[in-house]
Structure formats: C-alpha cells, structure tokens
Amino acid sequence: MNVQQSKFRLSRWAGATLALGLLLSGLGAWGLALVNEQQARMALEREAELLAEAVTRRVELYQYGLRGVRGALLTAGEARIDRELFRRYSLTRDIDREFPGARGFGFIRRVAAADEAGFLRQARADGQPEFRIQQLTPHDGERYVIQYIEPVARNGQALGLDIASEANRREAARAALETGQVRLTGPITLVQA
C-alpha cells in the first residue's frame, strides 16, 4: 500500500467519523430540544394551573364579601337600606386587607324607567342632594343604579352609575339577578379609575 492510498483511506475514515459525529450531534440536539420543549410545556401548564387556582381563590374571596353584604341587606330588609346603614356596614370591613384588589362594595338598586323620578327623590332625601343617574349609553330599559358605594372617597364617581347602560355590565347584572350567583363582567373601564 502506498502513501497515497493510505492518505485516501485515512481521509475516508476521517470523513466517515466526521459525518457520524455530525449525525449523532444532530440527533442529540434534536432529542434535547424535544425534552426541553416537553419540560417547558409542563412548567407552563403547572404555572397556568397555579394561576387559575389563585384567580379562583381571589374570586371566591370576593364572593364571600358579596354574600356578607347580601346577608346584611337581607337582615335589614331592602326597604330599610339607606346610605348611613350601608356606610356603617362597610366600616365593619377592612376592604383592602380582606378583599385585596377590590376597590370597594356597592349596592345596586333595580329601578323601572317609569319609577326613575321617585327613585331620584328618595336618593336625594337620603343625604345625597346632588344624586343623579349617569348613563354610559342612553337606553330605555330598567336601570341598575349604584345607589351606595364604599369607600366613597375612591369610588364616588361610580355613585349613580346605571350599569344597565353598558352591555358587559348589564349582562353580568342580569345573569347575577336571574341566578343569584356572582358573575364577572367582560372587560370594562371603571368610571372611578
């Protein structure tokens, strides 16, 4: 065997070794990418589950608060609810600590369009002489008016808002009214934000 043939054989072995190395490296990288993708997917699913559980716990916390308000209102009787009683009830709660993220709690009065003038007289006689109904979009149907809201200092702009004047609020309010269950609205912009 001459030197020329020996060099040729060596270069073939070197080429084959290089090709095999590249193939094995490629397969290893592909396998590692699959493992990494699977681990990333599993980590994302775990995080999504944890986030969903946290959101569920937060919503349940708000439900407890709303049920507490409902219990107080049912105990007092809807006809006896006034601004001072609602304010005193709200003082028994530490809204920021008990319901983190909530801006406050309110009482929404269902008012037939034909009864609007009488409702306004009653609301103004209840220590709110400037009370007026605010509509985001004019409509002829019944009103769902935020009559009381606490704390007023950071929610005053919502006082008098007819939530039936905006579709997302109206749909959530009707569903809550019909089912007796808490409902979330679709995306909205708070008037007091």
For each feature predicted by the language model, list its residue ranges.
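Intrinsically disordered, low-complexity polar/acidic regions
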Residues: R41, E45-E49, L74-A193
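Extreme N-terminal signal-anchor transmembrane helix of membrane signaling/transducer proteins, especially
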Residues: N2-V35
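A general, composition-driven signal for non-globular sequence regions
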Residues: M1-S6, T56-R57, D126-Q128, N168
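Juxtamembrane membrane-water interface segments immediately C-terminal to a transmembrane helix
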Residues: G31-Y64, R70-G77
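Aromatic-enriched hydrophobic runs in primary sequence
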Residues: A14-L20, G31, L50-E53, Y89, ...
